[in-house]
């Protein structure tokens, strides 16, 4: 199963849950394969009851956290679930008459604190900092939990749950065999279309001074497909491939409009259209594309590091963390190699007839990242209001 666990046959709420069906129900929710709010709630009830019945293996927990703060701290947004662990908290908090807000944490770093956007950023000591270094495209409203625009806006068009939309013939998808964007097959359909407007990113700068472009979003989309479907990469980063493939299977195509908006076509429906927008949102603007390209080269071609802890352990290489000078130095060497070879990733050379990065732009990116490393001795680069 998805969680490397398969439940036995269960009797839950007067109905039989077949062997392995708990896994199927979870993916049904994950992919939005329900026709109404009522059906979705029934699935939740069934899964909760089954989870309690199987609680030796399926962990259910209610967590209470406390976050002490001085009375002088003002403007702190408190999420109904996560408390101050939200992107607005430290962006808006202040102490009257002071230009500083001092925040303490139990640890700055542990053995599990790993700064890489593919298989890291998994513990609070990294995430609590990262949340203030990087602007997300969307985020759940602190008071309702409903997804909303943060630095990207979107429009949703859906034919679900019972009908489909035609995917335009000039939409593309990534082909892992040819390493190129190819037109979607004739007659391709999707349940929903989401149009993303990245105007608040484009033209602004990454922390190292280079302008944010659509190349950063597009590289991430291709990278995700490579990790999930390229046989050699799947062999190396198996855990990432297995967990990402179920959602990627529902993405049917991508298309750039003349005004630089990105259309995403997905087989996904939800009774709240904001959830469709959140589901379809591609990861793209967390780190600049040249860092991801260098890490891909380091992990899959040079085999001198790994994205995940499981791959790092299996192949006896570092679990790459860009905050550590040792690991950042490995990436810096690879950046130097990419610059020397004048590399422009295939994913950026031709996207539906558009070139998203020229050799000159790529060279400037490699140089800026290396200069950042020379100055900061790490490669944690993003685009939020604070930098590391």
Where do the model's predicted regions map?
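Detector for C-terminal structural segments
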Residues: 1-161, 226, 259-260, 264-266, ...
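Aromatic- and charge-enriched surface segment that lines or borders ligand/interaction sites
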Residues: 165-232, 264
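Extended charged low-complexity segments that act as oligomerization/scaffolding linkers
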Residues: 222-225, 231-261
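Extended Gly/Ser/Thr-rich low-complexity repeat segments
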Residues: 208-211, 216, 273-298
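Primarily extracytoplasmic ectodomains and periplasmic/lumenal surface modules that are beta-strand-rich
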Residues: 109-112, 205, 269-273
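Short, solvent-exposed loop/turn and secondary-structure capping segments
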Residues: 72-73, 114-118, 208-210, 229-232, ...
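Ordered hydrophobic segments in well-structured contexts
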Residues: 57-59, 193-195, 252-255, 261-266, ...
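Generic recognition of flexible, low-complexity loop/linker segments
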Residues: 45-50, 89-92, 180-186, 193, ...
């Amino acid at each position: 199963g998805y969680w490397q666990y398969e439940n036995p046959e269960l009797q839950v709420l007067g109905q039989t849950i077949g062997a392995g069906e708990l896994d199927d129900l979870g993916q049904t929710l994950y992919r939005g394969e329900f026709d109404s709010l009522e059906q979705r709630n029934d699935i939740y009830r069934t899964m909760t009851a089954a989870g309690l019945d199987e609680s030796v293996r399926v962990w259910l927990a209610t967590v209470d956290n406390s976050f002490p703060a001085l009375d002088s701290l003002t403007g702190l947004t408190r999420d109904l679930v996560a408390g101050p662990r939200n992107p607005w908290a430290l962006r808006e908090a202040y102490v009257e008459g002071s230009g500083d807000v001092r925040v303490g944490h139990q640890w700055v770093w542990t053995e599990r604190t790993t700064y890489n956007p593919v298989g890291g950023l998994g513990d609070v000591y990294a995430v609590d900092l990262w949340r203030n270094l990087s602007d997300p495209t969307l985020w759940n409203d602190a008071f309702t939990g409903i997804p909303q625009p943060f630095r990207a806006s979107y429009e949703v068009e859906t034919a679900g749950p019972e009908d489909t939309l035609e995917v335009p013939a000039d939409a593309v998808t990534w082909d892992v065999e040819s390493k190129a964007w190819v037109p979607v097959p004739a007659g391709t359909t999707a349940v929903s279309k989401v149009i993303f407007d990245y105007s608040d990113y484009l033209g602004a700068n990454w922390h190292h001074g280079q302008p944010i472009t659509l190349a950063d979003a597009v590289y991430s989309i291709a990278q995700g497909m490579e990790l999930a479907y390229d046989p050699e990469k799947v062999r190396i980063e198996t855990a990432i491939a297995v967990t990402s493939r179920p959602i990627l299977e529902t993405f049917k195509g991508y298309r750039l409009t003349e005004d630089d908006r990105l259309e995403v076509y997905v087989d996904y429906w939800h009774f709240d259209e904001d959830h469709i927008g959140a589901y379809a949102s591609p990861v793209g603007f967390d780190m600049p594309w040249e860092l991801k390209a260098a890490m891909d080269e380091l992990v899959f071609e040079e085999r001198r590091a790994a994205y995940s802890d499981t791959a790092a352990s299996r192949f006896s290489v570092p679990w790459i963390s860009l905050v550590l000078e040792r690991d950042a130095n490995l990436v810096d060497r690879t950046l130097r190699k990419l610059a020397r070879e004048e590399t422009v990733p295939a994913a950026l050379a031709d996207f539906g007839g558009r070139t998203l990065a020229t050799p000159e732009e790529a060279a400037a990116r490699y140089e800026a990242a290396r200069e950042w490393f020379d100055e900061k001795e790490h490669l944690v680069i993003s685009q939020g209001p604070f930098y590391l």
